[in-house]
Amino acid sequence: MENDMEEKFEDWKGKEAIPGKHGGIRAASIVCVVVMMENIVFIANGFNFVKYFMGSMHYTPATAANMVTNFMGTSFLLTLFGGFIADSFVTHFTTFIVFCCIELMGLILLTFQAHNPKLLPEKDKTPSTLQSAILFTGLYAMAIGTGGLKASLPSHGGDQIDRRNPRLISRFFDWLYFSICSGCLLAVTVVLWIEEKKGWIWSFNISVGILATALCIFTVGLPFYRFKRPNGSPLKKIAIVIISAARNRNKSDLDEEMMRGLISIYKNNSHNKLKWIDKATLNKNISETEVEETRTFLGLLPIFGSTIVMSCCVAQLSTFSAQQGMLMNKKLFHSFEIPVPSLTAIPLIFMLLSIPLYEFFGKKISSGNNNRSSSFNLKRIGLGLALSSVSMAVSAIVEAKRKHEVVHNNFRISVLWLVFQYLMLSVSDMLTLGGMLEFFYREAPSNMKSISTALGWCSTALGFFLSTTLVEVTNAVTGRLGHQWLGGEDLNKTRLELFYVLLCVLNTLNLLNYIFWAKRY
């Protein structure tokens, strides 16, 4: 929405924000640093939890894997809750402070349990009720906190940028994603190396220190930030508009004068989208602004829905791709053996190098196009979806090659073969998630920035859950045909390559669906 450029911002004292003193690059840079630190904590613990659940809490591998997947998915899904709080009741700054404290308390609780042998199960025993209660309380306190942080930080950073400068907003979101990738890289290299040398418990210790430092850094920036005060629940307003439009669906059309008024006020928006919403203006208590905001938000949902399958493909990096790596030759030299999680570092390094190049060439490509917020980012997302289809095809070829060499030649191919799928999926994620964060922020109504940017993270969550469901459905269907594609514990006896082909087909169909909605937007 472009009609939000006249928004009023305040400083931390409640006075009108002063350009040059409040907001700007300095304030947005603080947000990028905090995003990097938050992502170090989230990713490092995502890798650490599997070892912790299996080694210290004595859960089975399958249970531990599901616990991690559920934690990751829930964390991303709760960004909608965090976004709702930020847009409806308090500022993005306050949302961050509250949810960061919640995550920090959950992390401290898990660290305390890890250091206290009495709160851990004895050898070869499962956790007691008390031990499980402490574990899940700390775990999902972290998930709640993560949801609030990931929802509030991009919007808070975007609010620091002058919206009359679309290029600067685009640059901010490019470097925001650079910060996310930097956090991932540090997590899978430095933190993982310390964990391998010093033990998994160090991951908790480091995470507490980093998150506490991030909280302090973010708070120190208070005098430099500018804030937009929320004015009630936007979701409630949307519900009222939809209900009113439904009740008035059989009434006469809006008169020509009112329609002209709508078009003149929102001439930058496509008034032909969701015209049935206009019926809501027959209710005198509903403003034309509320109708247009509802139309805008509902128009984002098909784009959001079209990215979930791609997120399902990305989820394979932490599931089957990791299992493939365990069965491959991990030695790079005679004595050096690369940990499978560290394979992620290779595409991350490439992405960190490619983001500045992407920003440069993207700016050249979009020069003279003032509508980068929609058409440019829609093309960026579409390219990411297309690349994920290619990555699944490559994954199928690599798995077929790996299994053929093991079964017929008793030879384990190098783990570096996985770099191709890691690389393409990571670049696909950069294009899609990075594009979604900017697209949803730029296009969202002014009072729904956090909820709308949370849609990008929510897509990732639903992708994780869809992956779990798809595996179960695939096994159920193929089991009836005689042999489960993904059944059993021996990956060499599965048909993982066919599952990758299935994902390739589904994602290609999803790409066609996305193109349909993107053209209509």
UniProtKB/Swiss-Prot annotation:
Give any Pfam family that matches: PTR2
Q: In which tissues is it expressed?
A: Expressed in siliques.
InterPro entries linked to this entry: MFS_trans_sf, POT_fam
* Gene Ontology terms: cellular component: membrane
Q: Which residues form a coiled coil?
A: none
GO MF annotations, alphabetized: transmembrane transporter activity
Its record classes its membrane topology as: Multi-pass membrane protein
Q: Which domain of life is it from?
A: Eukaryota
What subcellular compartments does it reside in? Membrane
Give me the segments passing through the membrane.
30-50, 65-85, 89-109, 133-153, 172-192, 204-224, 297-317, 338-358, 381-401, 413-433, 451-471, 498-518
Where does the UniProt entry say this protein principally localizes? Answer: membrane
Keywords assigned by UniProt, alphabetized: Membrane, Transmembrane, Transmembrane helix, Transport
Function description = Involved in abscisic acid transport.
For this chain, the family text in UniProt reads: Belongs to the major facilitator superfamily. Proton-dependent oligopeptide transporter (POT/PTR) (TC 2.A.17) family.
UniProt name for this protein: Protein NRT1/ PTR FAMILY 4.2
